[in-house]
Amino acid sequence: MSSPWSLFDDHLRLAVRLTPNGGRDALDGIEADGEGEAFLKARVTAVPEKGKANKALMLLIAKSLRIPKSSVSLVSGETARKKILRIDGDPEDLVKKLEIFLG
């Protein structure tokens, strides 16, 4: 399985599959879709209206990685379950944090 992130010079991009109204805010590990593309499974308690679930996702990622919430932005998938997030910072350091958090 491939990894759900792509490294760039000053950031990484993270593929996420978000479940809104998920009962609790949590990152549930890495999975692959039918085409074999990896994504991070995430769920939030926020409802999918007016960007609330997207904001909750970005806050969850920032808290989980212990980075400023301003470092996380949505690249694509505003109204879709599959999203691409941009996380600003040293990509190698961010990957280490993701790997530690996801165990």
UniProtKB/Swiss-Prot annotation:
SMART domains: DUF167. SUPFAM superfamilies: YggU-like. InterPro entries: DUF167, YggU-like_sf. Pfam families: DUF167. Belongs to the UPF0235 family. HAMAP family: UPF0235. This is UPF0235 protein RL4503. It comes from Rhizobium johnstonii (strain DSM 114642 / LMG 32736 / 3841) (Rhizobium leguminosarum bv. viciae).
